[in-house]
Every structure is written in C-alpha cells, then in structure tokens.
A protein has these predicted regions:
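Charge-dense, helix-prone N-terminal extensions
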Residues: 1-110
C-alpha cells in the first residue's frame, strides 16, 4: 500500500491525505481517490472515475455509478503498471482542478 500511496502523493505538493471510513482518502480540490485493501490484494478507487478517459483499459466500473477502480493482486503487477497509473492519477488531478475552477468561476459571476 505504501508504494501506491507514494505514487499518489508524488502527483503534487497539495495532495492531502485523510482517513475516512477506515481507509486513506486523498484530496486535491476535492476527493481524488482512495486506497482499499481486499482479501486478495488492494485497489485504488477514483472518485470521478466515470469522467476519466480510461485509454489504458485499467479502470473497472463494477456495480458503481461514478467510481472506477484498479485492482492489484501483487506488488509486481503494481510496478508493471506504474507509468499507466501515474498517467491516470495526473488526469484525475487535472480533472479535479478543472471542476474546482469551474465552480469558483460560477460563484464569481453571481
């Protein structure tokens, strides 16, 4: 979990970590992603996952409307997909910043 946590924190200096629902959540202009252990590995869930491009085909929908996740069964699998995960994390951060700026712009026009 620490390898994936470090990848998330490497996205930028303004990433904040908070424990919610007994799991680590990461925030950047709102909720960005979270890490969740499973009995056979762990997964990273992206809060705005339904808006991500998923060009690598790694994001899974399962039975969720908005959240998309990537399940890892081993550290080797995580290391093998490191570059793709970093790209998804960066895209998620850019998306959150975009939505934050749009919301801020709407408030200024009122």
């Amino acid at each position: 979990m620490s390898v994936l946590r470090n990848m998330i924190l490497d996205v930028g200096p303004h990433i904040q970590e908070k424990i919610s629902y007994r799991i680590p959540f990461f925030y950047f202009h709102g909720p960005l992603c979270y890490l969740s252990p499973t009995f056979d590995g762990m997964y990273i869930g992206f809060v705005r996952g339904h808006q991500l491009s998923n060009e690598h085909g790694l994001l899974e929908k399962k039975d969720r409307r908005f959240v998309r996740s990537i399940h890892f069964y081993s550290l080797a699998e995580l290391e093998e997909r490191e570059e793709q995960i970093r790209q998804i994390l960066n895209e998620a951060a850019i998306l959150n910043e975009y939505h934050y700026r749009q919301k801020k712009k709407k408030k200024q026009t009122k």
